[in-house]
Amino acid sequence: MTVSSDTTAEISLGWSIQDWIDFHKSSSSQASLRLLESLLDSQNVAPVDNAWISLISKENLLHQFQILKSRENKETLPLYGVPIAVKDNIDVRGLPTTAACPSFAYEPSKDSKVVELLRNAGAIIVGKTNLDQFATGLVGTRSPYGKTPCAFSKEHVSGGSSAGSASVVARGIVPIALGTDTAGSGRVPAALNNLIGLKPTKGVFSCQGVVPACKSLDCVSIFALNLSDAERCFRIMCQPDPDNDEYSRPYVSNPLKKFSSNVTIAIPKNIPWYGETKNPVLFSNAVENLSRTGANVIEIDFEPLLELARCLYEGTWVAERYQAIQSFLDSKPPKESLDPTVISIIEGAKKYSAVDCFSFEYKRQGILQKVRRLLESVDVLCVPTCPLNPTMQQVADEPVLVNSRQGTWTNFVNLADLAALAVPAGFRDDGLPNGITLIGKKFTDYALLELANRYFQNIFPNGSRTYGTFTSSSVKPANDQLVGPDYDPSTSIKLAVVGAHLKGLPLHWQLEKVNATYLCTTKTSKAYQLFALPKNGPVLKPGLRRVQDSNGSQIELEVYSVPKELFGAFISMVPEPLGIGSVELESGEWIKSFICEESGYKAKGTVDITKYGGFRAYFEMLKKKESQKKKLFDTVLIANRGEIAVRIIKTLKKLGIRSVAVYSDPDKYSQHVTDADVSVPLHGTTAAQTYLDMNKIIDAAKQTNAQAIIPGYGFLSENADFSDACTSAGITFVGPSGDIIRGLGLKHSARQIAQKAGVPLVPGSLLITSVEEAKKVAAELEYPVMVKSTAGGGGIGLQKVDSEEDIEHIFETVKHQGETFFGDAGVFLERFIENARHVEVQLMGDGFGKAIALGERDCSLQRRNQKVIEETPAPNLPEKTRLALRKAAESLGSLLNYKCAGTVEFIYDEKKDEFYFLEVNTRLQVEHPITEMVTGLDLVEWMIRIAANDAPDFDSTKVEVNGVSMEARLYAENPLKNFRPSPGLLVDVKFPDWARVDTWVKKGTNISPEYDPTLAKIIVHGKDRDDAISKLNQALEETKVYGCITNIDYLKSIITSDFFAKAKVSTNILNSYQYEPTAIEITLPGAHTSIQDYPGRVGYWRIGVPPSGPMDAYSFRLANRIVGNDYRTPAIEVTLTGPSIVFHCETVIAITGGTALCTLDGQEIPQHKPVEVKRGSTLSIGKLTSGCRAYLGIRGGIDVPKYLGSYSTFTLGNVGGYNGRVLKLGDVLFLPSNEENKSVECLPQNIPQSLIPQISETKEWRIGVTCGPHGSPDFFKPESIEEFFSEKWKVHYNSNRFGVRLIGPKPKWARSNGGEGGMHPSNTHDYVYSLGAINFTGDEPVIITCDGPSLGGFVCQAVVPEAELWKVGQVKPGDSIQFVPLSYESSRSLKESQDVAIKSLDGTKLRRLDSVSILPSFETPILAQMEKVNELSPKVVYRQAGDRYVLVEYGDNEMNFNISYRIECLISLVKKNKTIGIVEMSQGVRSVLIEFDGYKVTQKELLKVLVAYETEIQFDENWKITSNIIRLPMAFEDSKTLACVQRYQETIRSSAPWLPNNVDFIANVNGISRNEVYDMLYSARFMVLGLGDVFLGSPCAVPLDPRHRFLGSKYNPSRTYTERGAVGIGGMYMCIYAANSPGGYQLVGRTIPIWDKLCLAASSEVPWLMNPFDQVEFYPVSEEDLDKMTEDCDNGVYKVNIEKSVFDHQEYLRWINANKDSITAFQEGQLGERAEEFAKLIQNANSELKESVTVKPDEEEDFPEGAEIVYSEYSGRFWKSIASVGDVIEAGQGLLIIEAMKAEMIISAPKSGKIIKICHGNGDMVDSGDIVAVIETLA
């Protein structure tokens, strides 16, 4: 629907809400505004329309429209651009509220809640409507603003009190208007104007901002032309508001949607019509049509309700009307402004006392009891809305009587807490309408609407219902369509669950995962049976089976609503033999439910549980039965760690046994420690000091009263002496006896035992003592043979010998290994079985001669004799052989009276179908879970029971193997480096939640090098082997572990191999397996090589998290585009000198950016072109000869985790990229597999030469900048700005990703100091910088780059726009820059041309900086300004801050909490409105930086919106805001804090006023003692004003008490290193350093970390601890205690003391006023002489600084021939050497550290050799290219 430019408001008359929305969606914003203006103009004409009291101005309309237009989601808003009228007793900001009394009028400071909700939904408020004064009346004639007539007759009343609202809707001026309804005012006008009148359940609409009539009864009501519009507004306004409305209440969840088809409707027996004859006809017809809907219409005596109605005006509820305006009446308002009838009614309240009030309330409660009984069997009441259609004259003649009669059927509704809906009943023969009211119990609003729709279909068939005055038009069927409450079947699927998904049962989480909504508990029809299927995992499964009715029962189930888009995800979690089908409910409805395959019901072990009536009852029976079982042990100690300890604890918890964990120092925070009921430290690091120390373990058991010790696997699990020691200590060892372990532990004796048990043996020998004997035996056995240590294990002490020439060497080696590792030099020989398989049988023995085999496992896939992947049942194994294996194992166990779990291992010769005894593991195996998966047993539980002599009856136990299970072992090891262990901190961990994963690791786990590298066992269960392989593959694809290198890629490679698919496995197959990793390997790291992505980490600048990303985004994006990647794909940034990289897979690369010699396998390759790389090739990127950075794009990208939405590396924060750091020698980076690679977008392509960036060969650059945010004349003198652009700036040596420092002319300041912001004219209150801002830190400019700080207190003269920032990424120290001014428009044009050119690869689209783009002169950065209105609405200055930022600055240069709150209001408004184009709002002390998307909103458009928003912000000084009070421990002047100061003194500046001690400096300049500084720190409460004051959520906070705001200064120059957690004071501000970072605050102590990088703490949803308006307090702790707290924080177990609170500004001001004398005295003491002395001190210090720069002179020196000269790749300060003269070092080893600005950079040795010279000492300045060391290369 569109309109032409000359269309008037007449075309919109009678439009519904949807008509208005359709118009706006199909029209331009100009057309939309014109139509709204036309509507407004049409109402601003003579004669005055009595329906309106006030209309908005054109300016107000434009303001509302501007705000609406700014909203990103405006077209989805339910009231998008819909004009709405509001009754004039409801507050609308911008219009007076009169309540129809001119002398009562006031200007509301904010909207009422309902108006706020309507505006939020997109509505445009056009005016306020007339009413009976103070909403007292049902006639619409009691107003000094005139009488509002009925829309159909000027002689008849419109009804009151909401007369005006009904009139403007009936005439179609607006589709919706708000009324209020205390006693019928929302219904009577609806009846008299042919409208819908919705009077909601009392309290579900907020009455905040509504002038009360009777506050306890008032409701806001809705007038609408159709049901759909009424329901739409109901849904919008139905929001609880308990903070502002005492009677507010939330709507019920899952409310009644519709009444039944035979709903019982009661009508009055006797209806007084007061002589009216026409309305009874309408009512009778309406009732008849209600009956036709199928309703059961009955007559009842309404007397209890009518009695209740009489209370309203005959009782003390009149007093409520008086209370509402008492203060107004006491002010003696002009009598002519008061309606005499209204005032006489209200003043009638004076006759009632407080006693009367209680009397009438008691009376009401008594009547309500009658009402409840009356309505017990009634669903709905139907009454005439009003009996009369009075004329104006009739009302004038009998004003009270007529009004009273009109309220006959309305007055009782709110008193009885009922919902009501007034609907039309048609027209009388005189053309006047009337209606009926449907009344339901509270919260039946939706059902009443649906009933009305049914009624309309009967009384107005075939769409014949008219609306309002539009009697020639009918309501479109769509406009009476209803949505109903939020549960919508069209977007969800009903699902019945019957088993473990029920509430409180183990799989209920799966429903929660898919956002299912509980609907009800019900039963099936009587046609079902319920079965418990055999348990083959930890969860019991049900089987619901439909049968003949005669054999079936009703089964209890729960019904849920599952969103359609997540239903597939839910189905994927359903294991076989279950599936999803349909079930018939007892109501006859068929819905989705679980079904079971026939095999499930027939499987052995299936139990018919129908008699229990439901799964829950059966489950409870099992629990009860379980609890009655024999108590096993009270306490069991787990003598192990890692995943097996975690797994054992689960079973102990299930059995109700108290668990005890033991732990080493590195395992202090491990999962088994936190999972156990009790944890005991073993005090040590190595295995020998802890888990292998028998005495410590047994002492821990005694200490905790453990009756048993279960050892798991490894460590002491097969130590016979430990088993004996436990027994001697009176503690049960959960395992076999020491004698059995000893006998089976030595391989030669194990062979003898096996032989005795009749178990086949591999041909072999007894123990051999000499080489000669070994040679003889080997010859007899025939080569190849295995030489084995009798005590070996874990792959140690066994080696294959192929020929006699090797036997001597290997014999001695194995003998030595046995003696070294196991204390036993015994060796024997066995024949080697070629292509043997490793098959083992899981054995359980009861200790009394009975043993049972629980199945076999194939564990043939091994690397370095360690198992990798196991499966059960063993594939390709004849059934006869399988049974023989099990029988042999049982025979061995019975012979030994074996007790508990053991594994009998066999070598299986598949070719000959023969098996031989290998050994017995006298413990639980790592791979035991796969046996559990196919048998449904809990092997640990069996072990515990057997150890307690409560073994199952093996004779009657029938073990059934169901399906196939596989396990893959996830190790922290590097498969590319011969499976070298790979310890590290895990930064991200994800496992599939549908598979079984036995693990001990999670995000934040530190993998120690001390122990086994096992991270997890990933276990799946399938119906057959193919299914299991498929599931294991899926599980491995979904497994993500970052922070250390794992074997996940290796595992995926194996299970997708052809040999694994065919089960062609053997113990040696992996030895020859050609693993082809999808990875690259760093063999030389380069100077500063990191992973970045574009656009980086967006949206966290306000927190102090920089975007990072590429310094040269243009070249970076080209690299990805050339190889065909999506622009967001991570790639590699190279700085100064590039890396060498080995590619272990084929791929395509491109190198862009600066020029360097690039070679592939020694052959030079071109840049800016796609290059194919073969597997095994080595790429080398040399030193950059032009530019500073190059970029390596790899097709498909690099597999690294996202951090805060980005792959980019931020090294200072140690986040993102590869483990949060630059790449190092030996790093292995995996590339995404093809299955998961979503980064590839198109084929690789060459790019035209014209797209290659023009990197300066002359070291001279021209860079465009936008002016501002700070300029002339307020900050800089005009000539200083001119000089900035006319002079050339040299790039300082101290430049990097944190910032590019410049050397050039000293600025000429327009002011002498920064006022409250600081002593230097460059200082200002902390605000958030723009990325690319040229920031004057004192007199020295620094360009803020992608890793730079966000919040700071220095002015910025210009900003490098986004399109020009790539040049900043390419400048090198010593280069010169000429800045030129650009307009916003030119900057955007350059940026947009780059985007188009890169996307299209069309060089003609690219615009470069040229004379046309450049402004002739600099421009003012001030874009707009709003003058001060009052103290709470200060001056606002909008400053240009680049091409994507606007800085909004409030008030004068002073810190003011009211300004901070105003900024918060603006941020909240933007967030609420989802304002188009705004990316982020970053709060400073008195400003907010707004980042915007130039593609969505222009700078000018944004300014209009921001100016409009300012007028929306209204508050007084009594504001409140949510505020956490955060209490932190702090160690005063701890050693680490003092070390930072010392390091600064040694390396940066040897003398300064704040040296050698910062606390002394603060005390001296403030004339106080050190103790007073100490007292201030621990007594002050600091208010957080902004975040990111030196990165990562570091707060900029100010003491609430002005007496705690000391004089002070920051370091100059700043520190390059500050300890994480350091607390600093800088003048009035306090900061906590969130990371090891640069800084300038005076350091006073240290607290716990405030940046939870991995969100490990239970309360951490985000990494940052604080938000603006939080309050911080410190309490003293020792340094030792703080270190422990810090360690706890780093491991997520420290709980920060946080108190949820509200900051009450009014209370704060009261406190300030109460202490004003001492505050004033303190502030005056800081002025005058002290301030002058302080300023002079700092001035002198700065002067001294300029004279103290030290650069070590060059020295001429000859070095030996062949010496390797090491040059610095960086400019900076020499911090320290990490190797010494005389050391022999390897290539790549670190030599020394250069510190520059915000980073430490290691210079490594280019070659191996001996260091003969280190050329600098600590603190020396070093330039890029300087010689820093000399190495003598060794032959």
Swiss-Prot record:
Q: Which residues carry this modification: Phosphoserine?
A: S803
PROSITE patterns in the record, alphabetically?
Answer: ATP_GRASP, BC, BIOTIN, BIOTINYL_LIPOYL, CPSASE_1, CPSASE_2
Q: Which GO terms describe its cellular component?
A: cytoplasm
- Which factors induce or repress this protein, as stated in its UniProt record? By allophanate or its non-metabolized analog oxalurate. Repressed in the presence of readily used nitrogen sources.
Q: What is one process in the GO biological process aspect for this record?
A: allantoin catabolic process
Binding positions (ATP): G122, A123, I124, I125, V126, G127, K128, T129, K747, E830, N865
Lineage runs: Eukaryota, Fungi, Dikarya, Ascomycota, Saccharomycotina
Positions carrying N6-biotinyllysine: K1798
Q: What is this protein called?
A: Urea amidolyase
InterPro entries xrefs? AH_C, Allophanate_hydrolase, Amidase_dom, AS_sf, ATP-grasp, BC-like_N, Biotin_BS, Biotin_carboxylase_complex
